[in-house]
């Protein structure tokens, strides 16, 4: 009908490949951002939860440490 250039679908093929490459790029960026979010959450939990709980556990451990009895109390 009104065909100006016989390109045998090269333009359509190129446009489809650009869409595929754009989609792969978006998926890759999303994956990198997800990994970055995981590292950020881990850092936040490390500073907010893990370190204070570790310090409280250290205080609890030192509080619960029992001194051994002296030898004059124990009669063997």
From Swiss-Prot:
Q: Where in the cell is it found?
A: Host Golgi apparatus membrane
Question: How does the protein's chain sit in the membrane according to the entry?
Answer: Single-pass type III membrane protein
Query: What Gene Ontology terms describe where this protein resides (cellular component)?
Result: host cell Golgi membrane; membrane
Membrane spanning segments where?
Answer: 15-35
Its assembly, as annotated, is: Homopentamer. Interacts with membrane protein M in the budding compartment of the host cell, which is located between endoplasmic reticulum and the Golgi complex. Interacts with Nucleoprotein.
Further facts: Bat coronavirus 512/2005 is highly similar to porcine epidemic diarrhea virus (PEDV).
The identity of this protein, by name, is Envelope small membrane protein
Q: Which organism is it from?
A: Bat coronavirus 512/2005 (BtCoV)
